[in-house]
């Protein structure tokens, strides 16, 4: 059964294959186009550099009118990531637009890694370290990067 969401996701997948954004990759799981596995490579010249962070994107039949649920599977220490791996990112909530596609979501998440929003943190400890003790924050992030190589 073909739905608008499934057709759109296949277009998103085709775009990811033909014009992949730097440092991100994603594809639907073999038997369900509504569930995607993704990987974000930590941006160069940031504490996240060389990290390989796995994520899951869960879409429903209302996509693209409703954003997917996006969750880190890899361990992540970041002001805008809950301990569950779920993200606090405006474009996945109140600033969602149907014009966003999978590539836009992943590049936004990648950008968020080095530019957190500390005004409404999901991880208060990470936010406080980021603002007040940057060296400690960066050490915790580097520990997360190393963990990303084995998880």
Curated annotation (Swiss-Prot):
Pathway given in the UniProt record? Protein modification; protein ubiquitination
Residues of the active site = 88 (glycyl thioester intermediate)
Q: Which reaction does it catalyse?
A: S-ubiquitinyl-[E1 ubiquitin-activating enzyme]-L-cysteine + [E2 ubiquitin-conjugating enzyme]-L-cysteine = [E1 ubiquitin-activating enzyme]-L-cysteine + S-ubiquitinyl-[E2 ubiquitin-conjugating enzyme]-L-cysteine
Protein's GO biological process: cellular response to unfolded protein; cytoplasm protein quality control by the ubiquitin-proteasome system; DNA repair; DNA-templated transcription termination; double-strand break repair via homologous recombination; ERAD pathway; error-free postreplication DNA repair; error-free translesion synthesis
Documented EC number(s): 2.3.2.23
Q: Where is this region: Disordered?
A: 1-26
Q: Boundaries of each UBC core domain copy?
A: 4-150
What does the similarity note say? Belongs to the ubiquitin-conjugating enzyme family.
Full protein name:
Ubiquitin-conjugating enzyme E2 2
Recall the taxonomic lineage recorded for the source organism: Eukaryota, Fungi, Dikarya, Ascomycota, Saccharomycotina
């Amino acid at each position: 059964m073909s739905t608008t969401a499934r057709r759109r996701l296949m277009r998103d997948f085709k775009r990811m294959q033909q014009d992949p954004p730097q440092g991100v990759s994603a594809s639907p799981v073999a038997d369900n186009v509504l569930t995607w596995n993704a990987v974000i490579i930590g941006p160069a010249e940031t504490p996240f550099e060389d990290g390989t962070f796995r994520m899951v994107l869960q879409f429903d039949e209302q996509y693209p009118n409703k954003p997917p649920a996006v969750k880190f599977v890899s361990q992540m220490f970041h002001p805008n990531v809950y301990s569950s791996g779920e993200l606090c990112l405006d474009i996945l909530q109140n600033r969602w637009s149907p014009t966003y596609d999978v590539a836009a979501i992943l590049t936004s998440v990648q950008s968020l890694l080095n530019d957190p929003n500390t005004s409404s943190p999901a991880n208060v400890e990470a936010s406080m370290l980021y603002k007040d003790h940057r060296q400690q924050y960066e050490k915790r992030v580097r520990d997360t990067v190393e963990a990303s190589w084995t998880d």
